[in-house]
Amino acid sequence: MKINKIYTLTAAALLCFAACEEYDQHVNYTASEPTSEIGKKLVANTDYIYSIYNDDTYELHSGVEVTELAYLNNEGRSIRTFWYKIDLTNPDITLECITPNNNSFVSAANEQLSSMLSHVDKPGHVVLGGINTDFGGGLGPQGVYWKGGVCLKDKFTPLADRPRCFVSITKDKKVFIGTEAEYPDYLAANGSKMSEVFCGSPRLIVDGKIDIAVPNDLDSESHPRTAIGVMPDMTTVYLMVVDGRRYTYSNGMYLKILADMFMALGCEQALNLDGGGSSTFIVAREGEYGDPARMDVRNWPNDGGGVERLLHNGLAIVANTK
């Protein structure tokens, strides 16, 4: 019995030594390096990314790239982001405002984004994906709203402590972000050129500088966000969703961090859109045109355990392939 104990202790010691020796050979852990263009710029130009565990980029069509970037931030919290990079100089690609049931008027929030996108998805006018856009209230979006060159809502609904801003996409596909105060003059000068307009708040970047026009206490919590950034050429656009309110999955962003992200990419202008449970990022997959099942929700809307919220409006990314 004594001999058996000696053998047992000796074997345990050898196993322990072997384990320690193996550990010594693998103690140098290195976080994965970014592989996407977006990931590389965010790592190089911000201090928010501590360790990347997913950085995947794929092209839906020439001029439309998706990047899905997941990481631990500098506080050790999980963050999952979803990005579109869109080149509007590609003659096939357009950004188009959409409404519930493809109505030619604004209405109450009564349709999910995936269903809204499916209404305009057809041969020759192929939906590649989309995001949610403006905050909603009552019978429509809170800001002015244009669809296909037609103004569906011509007034801004006041939002306390958050100056309203608009995004205009002209018929020649130039993207401009301005304030409610600037809208009358912009409309007078560009009304005949305007195609799509949607709104959001607050503005994040103005003329290449961070300028968030809200009281600090409105940026005291990290939330799911949706946002748009525009490069100086006015034809390169970033659309972004970050998930939040789910600790082990993703923890959202403060507005300041959101602004820093778009600054890191080189955006000249950026605007926060409706977030929280409205934040939705959709990529169209193979399938039958007009079928909502073709619309793949890539993020995790935090309403109802990942269920899409009913929305007032959205933005479609379209390939015109006629």
Residue ranges of predicted features:
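Bacterial N-terminal signal peptides that target proteins for export
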Residues: 1-9
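C-terminal motif of bacterial Sec signal peptides marking the signal peptidase cleavage site
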Residues: 16-19
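Zymogen propeptides
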Residues: 21-166, 174-177
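Conserved beta-alpha junction segments in alpha/beta enzyme cores
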Residues: 70-74, 79, 193-195, 199-234
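Short beta-strand scaffold segments in enzyme catalytic cores
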Residues: 82-86, 133-134, 165-169, 203, ...
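Structural recognition of the beta-strand scaffold that forms the well-ordered cores
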Residues: 128-132, 166-168, 175-178, 229, ...
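Conserved, well-ordered active-site substructure
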Residues: 140-161, 213-214, 218-232, 236-269, ...
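A substrate-binding/cap region within the structured catalytic cores of diverse enzymes
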Residues: 161-215
